[in-house]
Amino acid sequence: SETLANVSNLEARLIEQEVFAMCWSATASVAMVALGGAAVAVTAMRGEPKAIWITLGFFTVMEGLQAVGYAVVDECSNPANQSITLLSYLHIAFQPLFINAFAMAIAPSPVPKWQARRVYGLAALATGFMLLKLVPLQALGNCTPGSPLCGLQTCLFSGDWHIGWILPLNGFMEGFSSTFGIHIWFPAYFLAVFALPLWYGAWRFALFHLLIGPFLAFALTTNPNEQPAIWCLFSIGIILVSLSSFIRVRVMGAHQPA
């Protein structure tokens, strides 16, 4: 009976893994691409601010990269695998610009042009810091083994129930990662997407992003290299905010464009 119980437990775990695999697959990513494309079309035709539908399109591209990535997952020596991994990191690096553009579009009050220019400048600085992590500079050392996206090679691989990425990043700014006892491995990114929106009043959106971005990713997997890919579920939230006037106005407190 003990043997039968062990077999039953094993079968249960396998079924659970299969369910997760079915939920997170190339098919699911393709469906997200279709949903994102439809959302871009709808918001553009409705005359929404460009920042909204362009950001939707930007995150739809990430879902496309993930969908294509499934075709070469775990093939670390495959140039296509390496290229998709690099493109995925570049997408993450440029996210501060698009996230702030979106957040300013749904801020409680219109953001003055002078302030928007400074926001984009600071977001671009964060992007520059992210890109600098790719440069193999001996003076900056290597990224910390076990930290998000850190690896000895560039590869897209199978995670616990989604995909993950690793790259041979350098150790730039990792000295700030343990400030206040909290490990934040990409501090410039976090400041740009979570703190910067507070400056122009988009604190609700920043909190929303925090909950469905890193908190959701950390809750769903303990694999630090898989968490960024799951974080891209954030695109679902962007779609909801973009398409639902109730969520945008009542929940996010967005201003009404003139």
Model segments located where?
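Non-cytosolic membrane-interface motifs at loop->transmembrane helix junctions
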Residues: 76-88, 229-234
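Hydrophobic transmembrane alpha-helical segments in integral membrane proteins
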Residues: 15-36
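Membrane-interfacial loop-to-transmembrane alpha-helix junctions, especially the N-terminal start
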Residues: 47-56, 115-119, 201-211, 230-231
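Hydrophobic cores of alpha-helical transmembrane segments in multi-pass inner/ER membrane proteins
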Residues: 29-38, 90-105, 186-195, 234-248
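C-terminal transmembrane-bundle signature of multipass membrane proteins
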Residues: 195-258
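Membrane-proximal helix-loop-helix units in multi-pass membrane proteins
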Residues: 102-189
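Hydrophobic alpha-helical transmembrane segments of multi-pass membrane proteins
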Residues: 54-69, 215-216
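Internal transmembrane alpha-helix with an interfacial aromatic "cap," most often the third helix
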Residues: 40, 65-78, 88-122, 130-135
